Amino acid sequence: MITSAAGIISLLDEDEPQLKEFALHKLNAVVNDFWAEISESVDKIEVLYEDEGFRSRQFAALVASKVFYHLGAFEESLNYALGAGDLFNVNDNSEYVETIIAKCIDHYTKQCVENADLPEGEKKPIDQRLEGIVNKMFQRCLDDHKYKQAIGIALETRRLDVFEKTILESNDVPGMLAYSLKLCMSLMQNKQFRNKVLRVLVKIYMNLEKPDFINVCQCLIFLDDPQAVSDILEKLVKEDNLLMAYQICFDLYESASQQFLSSVIQNLRTVGTPIASVPGSTNTGTVPGSEKDSDSMETEEKTSSAFVGKTPEASPEPKDQTLKMIKILSGEMAIELHLQFLIRNNNTDLMILKNTKDAVRNSVCHTATVIANSFMHCGTTSDQFLRDNLEWLARATNWAKFTATASLGVIHKGHEKEALQLMATYLPKDTSPGSAYQEGGGLYALGLIHANHGGDIIDYLLNQLKNASNDIVRHGGSLGLGLAAMGTARQDVYDLLKTNLYQDDAVTGEAAGLALGLVMLGSKNAQAIEDMVGYAQETQHEKILRGLAVGIALVMYGRMEEADALIESLCRDKDPILRRSGMYTVAMAYCGSGNNKAIRRLLHVAVSDVNDDVRRAAVESLGFILFRTPEQCPSVVSLLSESYNPHVRYGAAMALGICCAGTGNKEAINLLEPMTNDPVNYVRQGALIASALIMIQQTEITCPKVNQFRQLYSKVINDKHDDVMAKFGAILAQGILDAGGHNVTISLQSRTGHTHMPSVVGVLVFTQFWFWFPLSHFLSLAYTPTCVIGLNKDLKMPKVQYKSNCKPSTFAYPAPLEVPKEKEKEKVSTAVLSITAKAKKKEKEKEKKEEEKMEVDEAEKKEEKEKKKEPEPNFQLLDNPARVMPAQLKVLTMPETCRYQPFKPLSIGGIIILKDTSEDIEELVEPVAAHGPKIEEEEQEPEPPEPFEYIDD
């Protein structure tokens, strides 16, 4: 057994090259044991490698590489490994080889990334030996069928040739394509390279045996290429593949931005016969009047009904097909279907609201209850609770009245056709001026009903804002207009809001500043930024500054590194409100990107800024950046949740709520639980609201602590001595937990993985309830119906069932609260004589004996009852339109005997086009009527009575 390598090392000093070669071979065999000893003479081995005439110089490089590896000098080790050429065996499983390959890939990646950012002439040449090892690694991955690993390395090293080759050579091309698309959506931070990858994916998808148009369009949304999408839709219509075109249109509406959709609509309009403007489509420069609107609706209905009875061979005219596609893309169709779903499946428990109403004793909690009611009934059009409690509702005065009126907009969200009739009593009238708070709230409500889908209502709100007589109506009008014209970047709307901002009125200015951001959402408009930041630095009103702080951030939505210069200047501003705006701008620009630089900036500000509001905003903003990977958020904010600063603790709670919304994440709930007992009341408020955001739509089975939190909300609300702040949080939490009649969830991304812009905006503005309660209503923008809606070729809902392959209780609605039974009044105890007591004792003994005889019978009866209790089935059939929670989608299938086949997997959910495989007549789901005030039709006057003779007695 060798105890020293000294003898072998001494051979390196010999003159004979063969002895040196022998020594190197021996050293290679023992280097792992004697590397420390060999390291003292490593210079001799290096000299041998540098000697061009030495035959085994590659072997010298290999030994030197191993010595440096053991010394921890990985860079030198890598250099010598490259010098070893083929002697460095990439297929070896040793720790040395694995480490050097990792270093090699890191080094190669770094060089490739640096080169990618340089112009063509300045690119540095990459060491061919380095590339050779990386290529061998790629081949090894392919040989071992480790395709995901190869795709990961190919994307990191920017090798699109290998990326494409790996996908095409894999044994599961659709699976690899889906994996690659997911990587593009969630992990890629460089926009330019991501676009190149998406182009490759589009090419592969299109070259498949059966082109996958649905996923191609998802890629094209990311590439911001509406023209290509329009071309695909036209191609599908020409090929008579209408159902696929409709499915793509629904997916586009759910995932694409307003600008993108309006470009596609514009392109479709220019193809073939010209088409009348479609009601509801946003982003058109001129909006049709209400008369045209009703005309186009009528013709639309006539054309669609004309084809119901036709044979399958007769295809509709191209004009009608394009009309339908535009109706879907404008969002009108999806909004109508979601409204139908929410009205039909409304499962609100009014008992919860009644108990809360009976417990509240002050105006703040009164407002909170009104907001909670609107959340619970969001989109259901059911205002029953308000009608039943008109006297209680009338207690709302001033701004509380404004909030209460606006809450109707949340209840009737999406109920667009009758919006003006519904709100008629609350809107400004020419004849007599009503309550300004009511009128302002009414205009805000109209905006909430038409959020992100303005159409004709934009012009109505524009005129109302022009003619508004006081600051309260202007406040509501600005918010309503901002919501309806969200993301349209319409110049006339922008100019009017800017005029309102420049009036230097605090109440008007706050809403106008926010509305400017909503209208210019994500536009990165330099003029808008200049106007808003310039005015923010001039104004003395804190309210206006607060509105602009959020507005500025919204203009930079989704702009990533393009917003860095603005973020830098805002973060350096001496005004804390503008620094807070910097935090929100980071949140909006990098939302959903998981960008490390953005996270580092927020964490730094969270612990270093001198202003509490800025620190709180910085921590809250973490939730927006991390929402694609909610499991990461608890570890990032866990230390912040224990901060000595209560504002940071509040921010940590809200960050968890935003990031893990709707997931039921156990770690997040475990962090929030101790915060519900925090000594500071507003931290408790944040923890209560965040817990509801996380546990929305969760059941006892999917999230065991949900009932415990329900009881906690109730306890806080009913405790007379608890603080108003905590009560406000608990009441809002109740509303969020049961939102939309138990049929909606909160998610910041669409079903297909795109960032859902209205949700992000809604949640950001919702967090501003800290300063201004009426902004709580913005959370309604983030509510997404959890539904599967199947449609036939005529875009009607057929009667069809879906099979949920799990026990019904797993995703069931929560049991309603029981009405408490009235307690019987206790009888006053009477004096008992000793004789009576003895007599009663004897009677009891008799009864006992009889009971013993009866026991057998009762036991038998119990057994019978247990037998009757049937075991729970392992599946459940759900009727179309079905309430299907996100986790339930995985177990959803079509019944085997079903005549319909879905155009895309049911596991994605949402609106799905169904292909009918039968010739039989279809049964359709009857639409249900919306609730709310109806305009009473004039009754016909009764006929006069028959003539008669009056005889006076």
From Swiss-Prot:
Any GO molecular function: ubiquitin protein ligase binding
Residue(s) carrying Phosphothreonine: T273, T311, T830
Cited Gene3D superfamilies: Leucine-rich Repeat Variant
GO BP field: proteasome-mediated ubiquitin-dependent protein catabolic process; regulation of protein catabolic process
Chain positions found as Phosphoserine: S290, S315, S834
GO-annotated cellular components: azurophil granule lumen; cytosol; extracellular region; membrane; nucleoplasm; nucleus; proteasome accessory complex; proteasome complex
PC repeats: 403-436, 441-474, 476-510, 511-545, 547-580, 581-616, 617-649, 651-685, 686-726, 729-761
Stretches the record annotates as Disordered: 279-318, 839-881, 930-953
Modified residues (N-acetylmethionine): M1
Biased composition (Acidic residues): 936-953
Alphabetized SUPFAM superfamilies for the sequence: ARM repeat (SSF48371)
Pfam family, one: RPN2_N
Stored InterPro entries: 26S_Psome_Rpn2, ARM-like, ARM-type_fold, Proteasome/cyclosome_rpt, PSMD1_RPN2_N, RPN2_C
Keyword annotations from UniProtKB, A to Z: Acetylation, Phosphoprotein, Proteasome, Repeat
Residues where N6-acetyllysine is found: K310, K720
Function in brief: Component of the 26S proteasome, a multiprotein complex involved in the ATP-dependent degradation of ubiquitinated proteins. This complex plays a key role in the maintenance of protein homeostasis by removing misfolded or damaged proteins, which could impair cellular functions, and by removing proteins whose functions are no longer required. Therefore, the proteasome participates in numerous cellular processes, including cell cycle progression, apoptosis, or DNA damage repair.
Subunit and partners: Component of the 19S proteasome regulatory particle complex. The 26S proteasome consists of a 20S core particle (CP) and two 19S regulatory subunits (RP). The regulatory particle is made of a lid composed of 9 subunits, a base containing 6 ATPases and few additional components including PSMD1. Interacts with ADRM1. Interacts with ZFAND1.
Protein name per the record: 26S proteasome non-ATPase regulatory subunit 1
Organism: Homo sapiens
